[in-house]
């Protein structure tokens, strides 16, 4: 740590169940604050490809472990684990760079240190895979590879003693014991241990991936943090938002950690405007152009960049983001815009745009003609119709708006969908929140206040219709949409809810915001989600007129 660095410090008694994340350009380390690699999602990753299960140090016969863990310090650029051993205090300093993981171990005196590394080169969705590993041994390093990839691991000034073996273990038992929910899908994993590193001295440097200097990496990361902190006015927000972004063969934002470690177009496009307002204008526009390059041949936008899986809402959201980019003076991918518009035209059935009912943001529910999807299409046809002076697009927009009023509006409230299980949801607010149609808002505001709002967020589905089912809970995206609607009617109430929402920062992952919460306050799902945090600077600006530390 350098003098002047902002930091979070956690003593052992306050660290139970907490995790942290160090990320750089798609490479990330996810781990428990007490040093445990207690989940199948813990370890060193390159986006959705895992490389390391864990690394472990034995100092003069004593392993660094949660039992002798003492204190944790996090700056966003580095993490420090302080352990109390028989030999004295040992500090483990961890840094992640572009393609590299570096750990410096500072010892109280000259000690013998053994280093064990569990390798598990696998895809994100895999468990035990049985791939064959090969190793190339060197004096102070070893290269481990299988058909998916390879990684070099080393200890500077150490000696590598090859003894390859593979074992089955269940790291997720630790996460389950610490209250992590079933959506982490913990199961048995395999680890390949290539051998042991032996080292003697007072300071050990362990590295995995590319060889690099920790000092250079830290200077670069601190510069980035300072630059973004000026925009967000909060170093924690700056650190968290930076963790999602990568710029490799294409640019993008990972949807969430630890297991939404892919570029989900919907999540990003919902947060396109908030990211710009958070000071990520360059990054957001680069990611938008990457989505354009991965557009499917029929003109639609897939749910995940690089996949063929369809998505109900990403295509109109893409059109709205491109329009915003164009109006701000940025170059918009017009060929892709026209393809996406044509896709919408071809799927217009006379009143609405057809979509797969299984591919809305509530993807565990079937929601045919979802109100938010139709609203996004109506707005997309409207803005591009005006820009292109295209009467057909304007006609389609008006037809969808007419259907929203005639088919969805019942007793002053918009239905969630025409073919779905639930009637009133946060999606019902979208036609008004995004100024798609105009109607009296008194009844929908009253219903939203009674059925969707709680003291720290906004439910996705009416509490009158369902309890704490998965998609009914308080989500980051539902809170964003709900607060935008509420701020028009009762900004003071919106401020109160938002202030309470902010208290969930770091509830599981240091500086991160969880994917979803129950009304009881119990957090669930991914522990650091893009659309749970990216809108915070925008709401601070809208509700207070400025940033807030």
Task: Give residue ranges: language-model regions.
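Terminal accessory carbohydrate-recognition/targeting modules of carbohydrate-active enzymes
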Residues: 1-231, 266, 277, 281, ...
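Aromatic (Trp/Tyr) and acidic
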Residues: 6-51, 56, 189, 287, ...
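Composition- and surface-driven signal marking solvent-exposed, interaction-prone regions
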Residues: 114-117, 218-219, 285-288, 393, ...
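An acidic-aromatic substrate-binding cleft motif
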Residues: 215-261
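Carboxylate/His-rich catalytic cores and anion/metal-binding grooves
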Residues: 216-235, 273-289, 438-447
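Short glycine/proline-rich turn/loop motifs
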Residues: 248-258, 265, 360-364, 463-467
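Aromatic-rich carbohydrate-recognition surfaces in CAZymes
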Residues: 261-355, 370-374, 473-487, 491-499, ...
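Catalytic cores of carbohydrate-active enzymes
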Residues: 301-302, 342-345, 349-359, 366-370, ...
């Amino acid at each position: 740590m350098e003098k002047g660095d902002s930091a979070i410090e956690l003593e052992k008694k306050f660290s139970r169940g907490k995790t942290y994340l160090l990320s750089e350009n798609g490479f990330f380390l996810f781990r428990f604050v007490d040093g445990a690699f207690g989940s199948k999602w813990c370890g060193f990753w390159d986006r959705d490809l895992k490389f390391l299960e864990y690394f472990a140090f034995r100092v003069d016969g004593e392993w660094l472990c949660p039992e002798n863990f003492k204190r944790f310090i996090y700056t966003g650029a580095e993490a420090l684990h302080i352990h109390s051993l028989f030999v004295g205090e040992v500090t483990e300093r961890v840094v992640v760079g572009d393609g590299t993981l570096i750990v410096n171990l500072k010892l109280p005196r000259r000690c013998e240190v053994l280093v064990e590394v569990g390798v598990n080169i696998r895809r994100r969705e895999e468990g035990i895979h049985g791939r064959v590993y090969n190793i190339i041994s060197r004096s102070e390093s070893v290269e481990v590879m299988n058909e998916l990839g390879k990684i070099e691991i080393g200890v500077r000034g150490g000696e590598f003693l090859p003894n390859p073996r593979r074992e089955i273990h269940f790291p997720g038992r630790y996460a389950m014991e610490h209250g992590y929910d079933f959506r982490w899908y913990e199961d048995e994993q395999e680890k390949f241990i290539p051998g042991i590193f032996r080292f003697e001295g007072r300071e050990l440097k362990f590295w995995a991936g590319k060889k690099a200097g920790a000092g250079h990496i830290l200077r670069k990361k601190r510069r980035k943090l300072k630059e973004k902190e000026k925009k967000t006015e909060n170093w924690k927000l700056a650190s968290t938002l930076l963790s999602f972004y990568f710029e490799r063969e294409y640019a993008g934002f990972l949807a969430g950690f630890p297991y939404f470690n892919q570029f989900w177009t919907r999540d990003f496009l919902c947060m396109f405007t908030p990211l710009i307002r958070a000071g990520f204008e360059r990054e957001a526009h680069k990611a938008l152009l990457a989505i354009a390059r991965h557009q499917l041949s029929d003109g639609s936008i897939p749910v995940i960049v690089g996949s063929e899986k369809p998505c109900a809402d990403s295509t109109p959201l893409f059109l709205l983001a491109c329009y915003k980019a164009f109006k701000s003076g940025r170059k918009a991918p017009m060929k892709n815009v026209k393809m996406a518009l044509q896709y919408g035209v071809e799927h217009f059935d006379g009143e609405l745009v057809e979509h797969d009912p299984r591919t809305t943001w509530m993807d565990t529910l079937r929601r045919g003609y979802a109100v938010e999807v139709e609203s996004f299409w109506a707005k997309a046809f409207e803005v591009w119709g005006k820009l292109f002076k295209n009467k057909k697009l304007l006609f389609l927009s008006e037809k969808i708006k007419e259907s929203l009023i005639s088919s969805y509006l019942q007793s002053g409230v918009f239905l969630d969908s025409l073919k779905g299980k639930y009637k009133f949801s946060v999606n019902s607010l979208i036609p008004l929140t995004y100024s798609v149609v105009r109607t009296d808002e008194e009844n929908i505001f009253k219903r939203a206040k009674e059925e969707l709002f709680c003291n720290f967020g906004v439910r996705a589905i009416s509490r009158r219709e369902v309890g704490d089912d998965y998609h009914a809970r308080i989500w980051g995206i539902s809170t964003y949409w709900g607060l935008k609607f509420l701020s028009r009617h009762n900004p003071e109430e919106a401020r109160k809810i938002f202030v309470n929402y902010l208290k969930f920062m770091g509830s599981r992952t240091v500086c991160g915001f969880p994917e979803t919460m129950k009304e009881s306050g119990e957090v669930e799902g991914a522990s650091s989600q893009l659309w749970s945090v990216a809108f915070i600077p925008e709401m601070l600006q809208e509700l207070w007129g400025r940033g807030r530390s």
